[in-house]
């Protein structure tokens, strides 16, 4: 990014406010703040969020993201946070996700077993929409001319059918060189059970001087389509993520750890080799902090709702099928049309955020999202000529008060927002910009509600016993309506809600995961125990020797009845009762269990978790800042008429204070709408806990 865009960013950085510390140079004679010891950075499509420990204080702020040069916003943020070479930086981002979504990756050549070159197109032969007369197919990441077959073959059990010769390896290397690849993916049939062929071939291909991704090293599991598709996606992302991470590492702004999709972190070198494990790093980071906020307020289970500028991420936390840490996990999922067979936190994402564009389609129907105005030009209220968005609708309705966003990083132009809603109202025949804005909010909240139902009711979890934890810049604006629709008893708006994913990245700790397909009878305890011990050794070897005694190990098994096509994940230990746990899980999921059927363990997984060690926070006095004795009054549109509502700055609200709706609470980087009939109480943890009144 250069020219005017860089200038706008610099101005925004100059305007940003940081909670808890003055980051400007200290005056003559004053003692400057020390460098930040730990920093969490989460880069989204619209904003880059930062939480740092500096001088015993926790500081938090937002900056506009720079999508054309994503490292720029991260480095600006670290400079503002006072990071130096000794600072530990935990970073989650959407760089890998966006590269896959936009298909802006490397020129990849795939090498697989001869006769299986079309596995990426054949897939599972499943139609995502069985009623589509002309179903749309997503093109594979590698075209047919760069999918090459190698003359070798293994049987399903690992026996050699056709041996891979040195002559064949030399021929494959020559053919691959002719395709001029920027990255290479290698995935041979059944190599998970006998990896020698694939390892030899991948080793020879590395002589070409480009990154080589091997399926047997990345995901040594059954299911060739998913395994090879994951490997291709990894190769597709390696050059871009390698350059991005090198830029960060060369900046001298800290010792980086990269947040992965399972919620832990990895060093940059490993993250650059396996970028496919980062595809959900941003959403994953916030879940741990969200669950901690819920438990601090007395709730063991929670629905998380992270509403940012581009998308909404939600998950059910502390449910029946979560791990020992209360976080929902799954082995694989589809990202941007590509199956990814890697451990992830189970986050559901929809294209509905503050920047979601509102428009009327050719049939006269109001559509909101999934397209987003992003950071540039952004919503109309940014004053850059952007389209009408959800944020503009909330500005017109008065739910977003004040004259700036993101803690002062962006000036708010209400006239531009109203003009955009007026144009939309004409297209909708809505009569007024306020009525158009109400329609936009109803549509986007319907999509958010459907997403919350998918991860709760449709997954066998009852939301009525859980709290709704809302975060992100816009999560608090939709909280009351969504909680009421789901019959939930409380909403939790955590401290630093606007940057909770950055806080989650900072607090995430280190995690390593290893898995292996075994296809063993559940009664074969000796073979299962041996495989688990091997995986435990692999996981522990990735931690420093001094850390290994503090690592918490988790063992899981993917199990099925013999003959089934899909598995359920259960705790692996104790092995003697593994089959019993599977039958209980099967009956809970499907309503029946055949306890006489043979039970097969398909894949074993071991995870190692090393909690983060953070500095003790020195709490600031509540009276540090002078605040108004009473709230401001802002104009709003409520129940079809104009009204004036109280607007509170969050710092005005001391513990145990109560605010009754309708009201607006503004924090640096986030806004909370307290609906009529709801009341908010300030919890000792700093969170605001909302509950419906008797009249709601």
Task: Provide a role label for each language-model segment.
Residues 1-108, 155, 162, 166-185, ...:
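N-terminal glycine/serine-rich phosphate-binding loop of ATP-dependent small-molecule kinases
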Residues 11-13, 27-28, 167, 171-182, ...:
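C-terminal, non-catalytic interaction/recognition modules in large multi-subunit enzymes and RNPs
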Residues 50-52, 61-66, 109-115, 135-137, ...:
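Glycine-rich phosphate-binding loop of actin/hexokinase-like ATP-binding domains
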Residues 52-59, 128-131, 140-160, 224-232, ...:
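Gly-rich Lys/Arg/Thr-decorated short loops/hinges at beta-loop-alpha junctions or inter-strand turns
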Residues 71, 77, 215-223, 227, ...:
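ATP-dependent carbohydrate kinase catalytic cores
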Residues 106-158, 215-219, 504:
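Active-site phosphate-binding/coordination module
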Residues 191-230, 606-622:
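Terminal amphipathic helices with adjacent charged low-complexity linkers/tails
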